[in-house]
Amino acid sequence: MQISIIEARDLSEAWFLCLSKTLSDGYDYHIERGSYKGQRRKQLDFFVCHIKYPGTRPLIPDVPQGVPAPSTMEYVENYLPYLMTAHRAEGEQYTYGQYLETQITEVIRMYKADGHNTNQAYMTVGEPKAIFLTDPPCLRGIDTRIKDNKLDFYIYFRSWDLWAGFPSNLAGIQLLKEYMASEIGVDDGEMVVMSKGLHIYEYCWDLAKIVVNR
């Protein structure tokens, strides 16, 4: 197993460095079950990325002219209710918010009422029966810690689309972190993100190469 460790300044740099690492070190993965079954992707064995200043704007990466943007802030703002509230649109099997909404409130309460030094402020996504869904949640947990009066997040994805998912996911989670920090009364902190399934689908390989080599 090859563990890839990436140090990044902000969300944009994290995305660019992860694209480069996945293109160079990712192995050929033929999908036998799940999204895009029968197709290929490049995937890292396991990766950990430490993002020092995830709140740096813009939260969404800039791409070369002619390359479709992986996300927009308008999309991220529309994504926030999916991340933070239990409301489900018609046809949705789940939202992250249905699992996180009450936990967000409890983590804020916990830190304010009981103090900052606890390892119990962990937010879980999913439940045992989620394994039977057609597409189980990719985000599985957000751990939190307050150190030096800053709220840090530790985020795990079981599978993670680097092109179409990573920028929107982390921009939305960063906005969630800023909201929680404000409610708790501390400063916004750092991020550590990890996955054993960070990947780029074959249809994005050429686009990713343009971005990395610009």
Annotate the PLM regions.
Residues 1-214:
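Terminal, non-catalytic protein-protein interaction segments that mediate quaternary/complex assembly
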